[in-house]
Structures are given as C-alpha cells and as structure tokens.
Regions:
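Generic, well-ordered alpha-helical scaffold segments in large soluble proteins
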Residues: 103, 215-227, 283-286, 290, ...
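Class II aminoacyl-tRNA synthetase-like tRNA-binding/catalytic domains
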Residues: 72-329, 523
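Metal-assisted phosphate- and nucleotidyl-transfer catalytic regions
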Residues: 241-268, 340-464, 486-509
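TRNA-recognition modules of translation machinery and tRNA-sensing kinases, especially anticodon-binding
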Residues: 275, 279, 292-303, 312, ...
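N-terminal chloroplast transit peptides
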Residues: 30-57
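Intrinsically disordered, low-complexity basic segments at termini and long loops, enriched
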Residues: 1-37, 417
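Short coil/turn segments at secondary-structure boundaries
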Residues: 182-184, 213, 230-237, 293, ...
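N-terminal plastid-targeting presequences
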Residues: 63-70
C-alpha cells in the first residue's frame, strides 16, 4: 500500500528516523520536560501523518508519543512512599530518580505549578509531586481524587512544610476514577464508612487501623517465636463448645425439611456432611491444649465465631484471638506471659507506626494516647488484685454516690461490668493495667482449675484503661475426676469431650493459658472506640454485606 507522500519503505524509514530522534532526546535528558517532549512528539507525528498513511498492519496501537518514550530507556526503580517520607534522613534522597505508584489524594493546579499528593498505603503520609509548565499542568488536569497514578521524577528539596517532594517528569493515569467517588476530600463518619467497607481502607482512619493491625500481628508472632512457642493452626470447624455457652454458628449441608428434622432428633445430623453436629469454633484453646501437652509451649492465632446477638461497640460475631497454652505452668506464669506480650506488641507499634499513632492520638485519643501506650510499654509492672479485694474497693467507691453507676450492685459472685473494669484500671490503679484473679467458680468456665477454697478458680482477667477486659486466662484443670464433675455441673456431656479428658488420663501436667482479643487490642492501641472499625470487614448481627 502506497502513502500519499511516497512509497511504504520510505514511510517506515521516516518513522524509524523519528524514533531515533526521540530516543536520543530522552536518553540524553534534554532540558525540556517530558510533557514538552511528548507534545513535540505528537506534533511531529501529526506532521508525518499529513504526508503519508500507514498500511493496516503497521498502524500504531497507541500514540507514538506514548509508545516511543520507553524505547531504550530504563525506568528508575520504584520506591514505596514509606521508604521516602519516613527515611531517617529524607534529605539524603535528594537527586534520586524514582517512580512512585499509588492513588491521588489531592490535586491542585495553579498558573505555573501543579501539586499532586500520592499515597500508596505503605505509610500514613503521602508524597507531594510538583508539576511545572503548561504541558505538565494540562496532563495534571486529567487527574482527580481517587485515580491510580504512576509518577516518575526526581526527589528534590521542598519549599513547603515537608522536607522533600518529587519533581515530576512523567505521569501515567493507571486507572481513572469516575464521578461519584464517595471519598472526596472531607471528613466522613465511621458509620458511613462501614457502608462502603470495600473503599474505606483508602481513608486515613481505616488505613491507620490496618497498618497498626498488621504491625501488632507481626509483633505477636515475633514475640512467641522469641519465647520458644510453636504456632499451631487450630480448626475452624469443631464439634466442641469451649465456653459451654451454646452461642455457636452451626455448620451443615442440610436444608429445608431435612434440617428441621435433624434439629429435633437425637443424632439427627448423622446424615449431614460431618455425620454429626458441627459448629464454627468459639475458641482454639482446647485444641491448643492438646499440642501444649506434647510440645510444651504453643499458641494459636486465628478467627473465632460467636452467635451472640450483641449490638455493642465491643462485640463482633467474627473476631480474632491470640491463645497461648503453656505446659508445666501455673496461673502466675500465664499472667507473666500475657504482660510481656502486651508490652512487646505495644512497643513494636510505637516503634514502627509513629505517624499512624500520632493521627489516632489527635483524632481519637484526646492527646493522651501516646503517653498512655508509652507508660504501658515501658512503665511499672501491671497491678495484680484478687477478685474479692476488687469487689471490696468497688463497693466502697460505689457507696459514695450510687447514682453515678449504671450497675451499682456489686458483691462477691458479680460478673464485673465494663464500668467496673475501667474504674479499677483507670482510677484505682492510676491508669495502669491490672490483673484481677481468683474469680468465683460459678461465673467462669468449666475447664478452669478449682482453688483449694472451693469457691474460686485460678482464673484472671487483664483490665486495661480505656477498654476494660483485654485478656482472659486461667490455669487449666488437670485432674480428671474434678474436670469430669465440672462438665456435668455445667450441663455438658463428658462423652462429647472424651478426647479432652484423655489428656488428663495420659501424662497429665499442670498447664495454663489465656486468650487475648486481637481486635480489642487494635482498638486499645489506636484509641478507636468501636470494634467494628478495627477489622477490615466486621461481622455483627444483621451485617455480612461484603
């Protein structure tokens, strides 16, 4: 096929000459900006196009100006924004050529300059990119909040509040953002953000919570590895009720009439998938105990489920638990380990998530969060208080003005409410965490070891300022006869726990453990009050949208 301006070979040679010219201009880094070079290339292409046309197979899939810029040019390495803005000496990066990729947070264009803040999620703060020149500003106008972009340029000293910024040389819109994007530059309520849980990690609050959650999870694994614990994966589907409360989600493949009949018959689920009743686990503790009685010190860390119809800001239907179990251990050693874990994980958050914590302190912590966390991580040992003594001090305090309390009736055998727990930690113990231990046996679980007084069990709760109960643990009952008797007392069938009783028959040892509500830990460290905002996709009564 012949072009209007000459033969096909001549056309191709002209294109090759144009390509060589543009390649030289890019590789030599001429003074013109990329945006100006791109504009020049487009103009040259238009001029060439007026003189000839290409055969169908030779047509370019995209504009020559976009295709040619990468020819023979090695792109600089991509850097995560965290490695730039949180570098120990950001000024040392001045002169570095790099590419950043992320999402546009803010876009501002002036007469001679344009500013684009890009955040890639690796850090709280984004990186400001500066655009100069008419061509660059024209490109920038195509970017809106929420667009995914890639920006290549050189790190330079900033004339603004930040130490450095990126002087943009190229801009690519990787993914555009349609009108109606719900996360415009304004403050949104946490309740609204739960309705768009798939987009809310792009906000400051939920991104900070997610990074803190990641940091705390990694710190948890690091702590137990250093302490010599083995990580055990406990089953999600179980036939046992660890808590004996019966608030469990049933797992079944039956439906309709078959399910209705099975629920009313003894052994009615023998035709079900598992040939018996099965549930989502409420705890990995019982499974962890079996491994502790073979491997010494172990822990589980995973999701657990409870079909409790609770709409409070402290409860979820699906939540994560850290559950260590230690063989040849007593309640004292369990409390020691829980204290060390909490101090270690909080220290890691303070060390690695400073910007996120400062944000949380400003918007959720009443400017006291950092001080409180530092005090917990590096301050005095946690207070230890017997339950009976806790009841005494509470009764004395409540007697001063019962009207100030939602639950003023406290006596031995009362299951402490959140207001009681918080007063003990925040006021009575001066803002320190406190272990309350030796609880009445009637309000604790069947597997907890009876004390010699016959009234209490070797159980503890760790109460933290601001949240109340954070950890619950105990020394486990290792005596077969007493454990079996308590099962009957609590309305459980020992036959359902035959394997758990076997641990006491074959080489039984004293052992202890605890459970730490991981989502509550995230709330405690971030000062975010509602537990539904501590987890990516919260599950609670009436809500499993995503």
């Amino acid at each position: 096929m012949r072009g209007r301006g000459g033969s096909e070979p001549g056309n191709i040679e002209t294109l090759k000459s144009l390509e060589r010219l543009l390649k030289r201009r890019v590789t030599q880094r001429m003074s013109m900006s990329w945006f100006a070079a791109r504009a020049m290339a487009c103009a040259m292409l238009a001029a060439v196009g007026r003189s000839f046309s290409l055969a169908p197979k030779a047509r370019l899939a995209r504009p020559l100006c976009a295709a040619t810029m990468d020819v023979g040019v090695e792109a600089p390495p991509r850097l995560k924004i965290k490695s730039i803005v949180e570098a120990e000496a950001p000024e040392s990066l001045v002169g570095t050529k790099t590419v950043i990729k992320g999402w546009a947070r803010t876009v501002r264009a002036q007469k001679a300059l344009g500013f684009l803040e890009v955040n890639d999620g690796s850090s709280f703060g984004g990186l400001q990119c500066v655009f100069e020149g008419e061509a660059a500003l024209k490109e920038l106008k195509a970017v809106s909040t929420g667009c995914a972009v890639a920006v290549e340029g050189e790190i330079v000293k900033s004339g603004g509040k930040q130490a450095i910024e990126l002087k943009a040389e190229t801009l690519e819109i990787v993914g555009g953002c349609e009108e109606g994007y719900p996360l415009q530059k304004k403050r949104h309520s946490l309740e609204f953000l739960r309705s768009i849980a798939h987009l809310r990690p792009r906000t400051n609050t939920l991104a900070a919570a997610a990074r803190l959650r990641s940091c705390l999870a990694q710190a948890t694994h690091s702590f137990f590895e250093q302490e010599g614990f083995a990580y055990v994966h406990s089953p999600i589907i179980t036939a046992s009720d660890c808590e004996g409360a019966g608030e469990m989600f049933r797992v079944t493949s039956l439906s309709g009439d078959a399910l209705a009949k099975a629920a009313t018959k003894e052994n009615g689920f023998e035709d079900d998938f598992f040939a018996r009743s099965a549930f989502l686990t409420v705890s990995g503790q019982l499974s962890a105990e079996t491994y502790a009685c073979a491997m010494g010190d172990v822990y589980t860390f995973g999701p657990t489920f409870r079909a409790e119809n609770s709409q409070t800001s402290r409860h979820l239907a699906e939540f994560w638990m850290i559950e260590p179990e230690m063989a040849f251990a007593t309640i004292t050693e369990a409390m020691d380990n829980a204290e060390a874990l909490l101090k270690s994980t909080i220290s890691a958050a303070l060390d690695k998530c400073g910007a996120d914590l400062k944000f949380c302190d400003q918007f959720y912590g009443d400017k006291e969060l950092l001080d409180r966390l530092t005090s917990i991580a590096t301050g005095a040992p946690f207070v230890r208080l017997k339950y009976a003594d806790a009841v005494d001090v509470l009764r004395a305090e409540i007697a001063k003005d019962p009207s100030k309390w939602q639950f003023p009736d406290v006596e031995f055998g009362t299951d402490l409410a959140t207001e009681h727990e918080r007063w003990l930690a925040e006021t009575h113990c001066g803002g320190n965490c406190v272990f309350v231990y030796d609880y009445p046996r009637t309000i604790k679980s069947f597997y907890m070891r009876d004390n010699d007084d016959g009234k209490t069990v070797a159980a503890f709760d760790l109460l933290a300022p601001g949240v109340g109960e954070l950890v619950g643990g105990s020394q486990r009952e290792e005596r077969t006869d007493k454990l079996e008797a308590k099962m009957v007392e609590f309305g459980l069938d020992p036959e359902d726990y035959w394997w758990y009783l076997d641990l006491r028959k074959y080489g039984s040892v004293p052992h202890a453990g605890y459970g730490l509500g991981f989502d509550r830990l995230v709330c405690y460290v971030s000062a975010i009050e509602n537990i539904r905002d501590s987890i990516p996709y919260p599950r609670y009564p009436g809500s499993a949208t995503f």
